[in-house]
UniProtKB/Swiss-Prot annotation:
Binding site for NADP(+): 47-71
GO molecular function: alcohol dehydrogenase (NADP+) activity
Descriptive protein name: NADPH-dependent aldehyde reductase 1, chloroplastic
CDD domains: SDR_c1
Species, as recorded: Arabidopsis thaliana (Mouse-ear cress)
SUPFAM superfamilies: NAD(P)-binding Rossmann-fold domains (SSF51735)
Family that this chain belongs to: Belongs to the short-chain dehydrogenases/reductases (SDR) family.
Residue ranges with Polar residues bias: 20-32
């Protein structure tokens, strides 16, 4: 599936330069207005899983706003924005793309304010942005890197959720992207895996807090999914063999994960789901 030419040398990775492009859409996906009239904010929505979620949400009638890394993902963001405009339904509003660094509270507040100024509210919040760096020992993880990973991967979830909740009503949904690594561990992604475990706990605790308000909180824990984060994180050998260790013997595609988010965002489909995590992971068995 991948070759040595795939290797990228900077986070968070760029989709438009990938030799084997991730699949964010499919002719087999048949929308049915599951999210008609909803306003969705997707972090890290310019590529990978976030782009596929945006595609499905827009196809299902949602108005979509997404964030991307300021100054690093402009081309991916513009391609995603154009795609969303093409697949959106006639009764949804024009999508918007917001460049930012989500690791800081003031930036997260600005993102929420921009979405609310444009669309009046937030019905679905997708906390999805992440970064990861490979290391062989804990000694390699210095304080600046540890803080950077935690700021992006879990601090931003707290920041965005806190600000977004002011504009979310009963029936709204929060969906957090965790990882199969939160359940099985990963020796070479120690700091990343720790944040993903924190996201599971955050999801379950927040679900308990918000149940009385009628706001559901769930998560998705993808397995090995082919996104720009992979060639930006691993060495050539791991890129080449990525996904081969799961029972299905291949990496998943973003479009194979995105319907899980549609399911959790749709009240008709998942009104009795909160505090739960879905596991699209190619057959890896985890203790949920």
């Amino acid at each position: 599936m991948a070759s040595e030419k795939q290797k990228q040398h900077a986070q968070p990775g760029k989709e438009h330069v990938m030799e084997s492009s991730p699949q964010f859409s499919s002719s087999d996906y048949q929308p049915s207005n599951k999210l008609r009239g909803k306003v969705a904010l997707i972090t890290g929505g310019d590529s990978g899983i976030g782009r596929a979620v945006g595609y499905c949400f827009a196809s299902e009638g949602a108005t979509v706003a997404f964030t991307y890394v300021k100054g690093q993902e402009e081309k991916d963001a513009q391609e995603t924005l154009q795609m969303l405009k093409e697949v959106k339904t006639s009764d949804s509003k024009e999508p918007i793309a917001i460049p930012t660094d989500l690791g800081f509270d003031e930036n997260c507040k600005r993102v929420v304010d921009e979405v609310v100024n444009a669309f009046g509210r937030i019905d679905v919040l997708i906390n999805n942005a992440a970064e990861q760096y490979e290391s062989s020992t804990i000694e390699e993880i210095d304080e600046p890197r540890l803080e950077r990973v935690f700021r992006t991967n879990i601090f931003s979830y707290f920041f965005l959720t806190r600000h977004a909740l002011k504009h979310m009503k009963e029936g709204s949904s929060i969906i957090n992207t965790t990882s199969v690594n939160a359940y099985k561990g990963n020796a070479s992604l120690l700091d990343y895996t720790a944040t993903k475990g924190a996201i599971v706990a955050f999801t379950r605790g927040l679900a308990l807090q918000l149940a009385e308000k009628g706001i559901r909180v769930n998560g998705v824990a993808p397995g090995p999914i082919w996104t720009p984060l992979i060639p930006a994180s691993f060495n050539e050998e791991k890129i080449k063999n990525f996904g081969s260790e799961v029972p299905m013997k291949r990496a998943g595609q973003p479009i194979e994960v995105a319907p899980s988010y549609v399911f959790l965002a749709c009240n008709h489909c998942s009104s009795y789901f909160t505090g739960q995590v879905l596991h699209p992971n190619g057959g890896a068995v985890v203790n949920a």
